[in-house]
Amino acid sequence: MKKFFLVIVLILVASGVFLLVNHQLKLMKYDFKGDSINGPVTMKSFDGEYKIAYFGYVFCPDVCPTTLTLVATALDDLKYKDVKILFATLDIKRDDVKTCDEFAKYFYPNSTCLRFDDKELDRVTKSYGVKYQIVDLKDSVMKYSVAHSSSIYLFDKKGRFVKEVSNLTYENVKKEIENLIKNH
């Protein structure tokens, strides 16, 4: 009987350790070290606010303005004030922190631009599953464009990943933000 009890205790301890390590790995997967208008930041810098992460770039002609407008409209309609949009630039050659931050705040005042170095951008986009590619535009003043995926990523107030939202209709985005606030 003692052996059985000991085995059960060991299984419970091992399960607890596994769950704790797994939880820490999930938190690390979505963490980052970047620059913002206020200096260096990590996901923890935004604790206390719900977060919506979005990857794009300032010179984006269509997807970024549309997505940021859609998210901002849903947030305004829901009247949620403690939600931060984290706009992570994919164009680190052209987007400086100040211009990027102004761009994000144009759509939603409680936004922050995140700018990463090459290595961190590569790591973060892989962790989040963001797809992007620099596309040469030979006969354009812009020289290149950035083709990219358009999902938004929802996080609770402690920086825990909640959901990736790729169906970016107004109704769906509003519903997913409501679910984030009500359930997390």
Give, region by region, the residue ranges found by the protein language model.
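Short active-site neighborhood of thiol/selenol oxidoreductases, capturing the structured segment around
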Residues: 44-65, 71
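Extracytoplasmic
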Residues: 29, 47, 82-85, 147-150
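Hydrophobic membrane-insertion alpha-helices, especially the h-region
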Residues: 5-20
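Thiol/disulfide oxidoreductase modules built on the thioredoxin-like
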Residues: 122-176
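Structural microenvironment flanking redox-active thiols in thiol-disulfide oxidoreductases
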Residues: 68-124
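Cofactor-binding loop segments of dinucleotide-utilizing enzymes, especially the Rossmann-like FAD-
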Residues: 55, 90, 157
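Extracytoplasmic/luminal low-complexity segments enriched in Pro/Gly and acidic/polar residues
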Residues: 181-184
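N-terminal "domain-start" segment that seeds a small globular fold
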Residues: 17-47, 69-70
